[in-house]
Amino acid sequence: MKIFLRLTKKIIYQIIFQFFFLKFFFLKLFKNKIIIFDIDNTVANTWPSLLKKNMNEKERLSNLKPFENIVKLILNYNKSGEKIIFMSARDYKFYNITKSWIKNNCVKNFDLILVSNVHEKLKLLKIFKNKNITFYDDLSYSHENEVTLFYEDILNKLKELNNVKHIGYNELLVLQKKNYDKKI
């Protein structure tokens, strides 16, 4: 029975991924420049919430604190008319919570893509061969264990995508201190 449930979940996740894949594919038809933001530890200060006890996942995700300067950056992109996509490796059942969080904390005009794991982000980025992409993603994990680790395999593969400008962990730390009252 467990094997059947696991297999069913995997099939459902593949169907959902295909939906987001198609959504992403059609988005590429509209703009030449696309701005993509990860959410956890990029737009939202997520890792401290992982240390809190007695909080269910829905409540935890709903109460994340945004990084104020990154939100200002997003708002500047939005004012400039840029296409903004949020792409996060989160369970698909949190799609509506994630969408509400973005609307309440960042911007109203955006697209949201959820993937079941961080490696699927790379698959989606490869669709946009003829588009200029600015991709904000720390690509890190394990902060809550007092050691920050990185998805080195993805970081290396991103370097091969000439159309993708990756803004990573160190750059995001600098952006947190930058003033975004001026136009980009």
Please tell me what each predicted stretch does.
Residues 1-37, 183-184:
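Non-catalytic pre-domain segments flanking phosphatase-related domains
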Residues 56-85, 95-98, 118-119, 123-124:
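Short, acidic loop-to-helix structural element flanking the phosphoryl-transfer center
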Residues 44-56, 100-106:
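Short, basic/glycine-rich phosphate-binding loops at helix/coil junctions
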Residues 31-33, 81-83, 130-133:
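Short coil/turn segments at beta-strand junctions that form active-site/ligand-binding loops
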Residues 42-44, 50, 92, 142:
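Active-site loop signature of alpha/beta-hydrolase-fold enzymes
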